[in-house]
Amino acid sequence: MKIIGKWALLIIAALSLPVKAALDIVITEGVDAARPIAVVPFVWQGTGPVPSQISDVVASDLTRSGTFKPLDALGLPQSGISTLAEFAPQKWTGINAEAAVVGAIKPYGPDQYLVTFDLIDLLKAQLAGQAPLNKQDLLLDSRQTVITAAQFRQYGHRISDVVYEKLTGIRGAFLTRIAYVVVNHAEKAPYRLMIADYDGYNEHMLLRSPEPLMSPAWSPDGRRLAYVSFENRKAEIFVQDIFTQARTKVSSFPGINGAPSFSPDGKTLAVTLSKDGQSEIYTIDIATKTTRRITNHYAIDTEPSWFPDGKSLLITSERGGRPQLYKVELDSGKLTRLTFDGEWNLGGSITPDGRTLIFVNRTNGKFNIARMDLETRFMQVLTTTRLDESPSVAPNGTMVIYGTTHQGRQVLAAVSTDGRFKARLPAGQGEVKSPSWSPFL
């Protein structure tokens, strides 16, 4: 049985507020086609009520992934089991699920709990039929760790990460965060830069302002956010440490200071500046504030983002007459147009594996999130929502969070990169925009 250390939980726990969901996730499409899985309620081996039901977090995570569909816990053939040893393969015959998650929670010390879980291969059990079976061969994973009461939800995300990776081969992204801007004009300082767990829980306010805030972008180590603030009645770019709250003004040139994007090594920002007349792409060394001009054209160049190797930028440019996406090689300055389908293509980013372009496509006047395979150049429109903008890709490349409009309000939404799973993330109060998905934490 493996021991999961607490280090992966400390980053999240440091920012946690009382547990609540600031953004309610409303799944709109894709659950029925997902892969069935059994998440058995974890057994509480203490007295009094269970402090928190981790299995609920796991089931919700797997549902929101768009890949799995947890079965109704009340209809499972076994309940009250916590280990593979208690698993009875014959009772699961005919259950349409590929795996089962079982576990237990028991007191370990003052404000400490031991959490154990096993991931069981149901497909192998069913394929064996009545043949002799070594139950140990069904064990896909088994782990335990000691957590505090404040870490229940985060450890549930960690279990989900393990389950997701074991069954798909792709690293889970449940122990990640999102940054976004909330706007509520009923308040004196209506603009708030917020951080929350990927599912909207544990919301934390980083900054509040009477003037607009926009374009948050994570550093690759997950410790800092770059963003644009108009707090001094003009656009300026700041970098802020999300733990210490210390922040540095990186760019305050005349005109546009916008669209910051961290380089893969975290040392440089790619930005949009108009200090020399036109809207152009620059890089800024964060430590020295040294700028380097990357583009030089009379047309608008904006919205830079980095290719994973750090050697090129993806930009939106109107040099062809309409907004399209281009690749700019930093050493040579070579410019390559990437998009041709539709009327406009803008606001792009590259998936972490460097293979896929995620962007906003306008066709017939409709703005939707789209993807394009960089090798085959095949493009697929992923969404059917309205006025989509600001797509941000999960660090495992499987999901995209973006801004859209629903019933006249700006909300966040999510779509899987295959377009099959869709969800909305409306806020309880105000409007939400400019999402940015964190790296792995």
Curated annotation (Swiss-Prot):
One of its GO terms (biological process) is cell division. Keywords: Cell cycle, Cell division, Periplasm, Signal. GO terms for cellular component: periplasmic space. Its main location: periplasm. InterPro entries: 6-blade_b-propeller_TolB-like, PD40, Tol-Pal_TolB, TolB_N. It comes from the Bacteria. Residues 1-21 form the signal peptide. It is found in: Periplasm. The keyword Cell cycle applies. Pfam families: PD40 (PF07676), TolB_N (PF04052). Part of the Tol-Pal system, which plays a role in outer membrane invagination during cell division and is important for maintaining outer membrane integrity. Belongs to the TolB family. The Tol-Pal system is composed of five core proteins: the inner membrane proteins TolA, TolQ and TolR, the periplasmic protein TolB and the outer membrane protein Pal. They form a network linking the inner and outer membranes and the peptidoglycan layer. This is Tol-Pal system protein TolB. It comes from Shewanella amazonensis (strain ATCC BAA-1098 / SB2B). The gene is tolB.
